[in-house]
Design a protein with these regions (language model features):
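N-terminal amphipathic alpha-helix/helix-capping segment at the start of soluble metabolic enzymes
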Residues: 16-35
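Active-site mouth loops of central-metabolism enzymes
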Residues: 34-48, 99-103, 123-127
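Hydrophobic faces of well-ordered beta-strands that scaffold small-molecule active sites
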Residues: 34-36, 64-66, 124-126, 145-147, ...
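Active-site beta->alpha loop and helix N-cap motifs at the rims of alpha/beta catalytic domains
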Residues: 89-150
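Catalytic alpha/beta core domains of metabolic enzymes, predominantly
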Residues: 177-199
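Active-site-adjacent beta->alpha loops and helix N-cap segments on the catalytic face
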Residues: 147-165, 176-183
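Glycine-rich, proline-tolerant flexible connector loops at the mouths of alpha/beta enzymes
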Residues: 63-102
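Glycine-enriched alpha-helix->loop->beta-strand junction motifs that scaffold or abut catalytic
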Residues: 138-145, 163-168, 188-194
């Protein structure tokens, strides 16, 4: 079965239906949909960010993905051990707040980056991390929402995205099966069947 629902000993098959992001069909029989992730690679330099958009288009990406948060919307400013990075990374000893201040994509850049991506034939959407980010993305008329796997248990955030009736892409990398099921169910309860799961 492509998608299994166990009812007693019976397995039902639900074939995935096609959906579209900015008019580009995604699903069985369609070309692979390639998303270029900007993340923090802009290094707080807008011109570098624009260069990344152009590089993504030249490489054949169908979409550019941003991340929409600020240090204050994703964590608190604290130097307590729980808020310090450890474990042998490049950022050991730094606070989470400090890291996110360096890594975030300024919100005033995002409409301009979206416009640049669209000029080059790419869709542009983002990962929100709190309700204000969803509201901002709606103002920009972004065509889809990508939920980071660390946020898959944030059911209120997922419901807010689902209520826009736009495609919701759920990353599942660090999620348990039950968490994935709860996220999918939340979308469906909001009447949104446009759900994509990423391994």
């Amino acid at each position: 079965c492509r998608e299994k629902h166990l009812q007693g000993n019976r397995c039902e098959e639900n074939k995935m239906e096609q959906l579209a992001i900015d008019g580009r069909k995604i699903g069985p029989g369609e070309k692979t949909y390639i998303v270029a992730e900007m993340s923090a690679n802009h290094l707080q330099d807008f011109h570098r960010a624009v260069e990344i958009v152009h590089a993504a288009a030249e490489a054949g990406a169908d979409a550019l993905k941003l991340q929409t948060y600020t240090a204050d919307t994703i964590t608190i400013e604290s130097d307590k051990p729980y808020f310090r990075i450890t474990g042998g990374t490049l950022w050991d000893g730094q606070t989470l707040h400090g890291l996110y201040e360096e890594a975030y994509t300024p919100w005033d850049w995002q409409p301009r980056l979206k416009e640049e991506a669209e000029k080059l034939g790419m869709a542009c959407f983002s990962s929100p991390f709190d309700p204000t980010a969803v509201e901002f993305m709606e103002e920009m008329k972004m065509p889809a929402y990508k939920i980071a796997s660390y946020e898959i248990t944030d059911i209120p955030l997922i419901r807010q995205c689902a209520r826009t009736m736009k495609p919701v892409i759920l990353a599942t990398g660090v999620a348990h099966k039950e968490e994935i099921e709860a996220a999918v169910q939340a979308c469906r309860e909001e009447g949104n069947q446009q759900i994509l799961l990423l391994k």
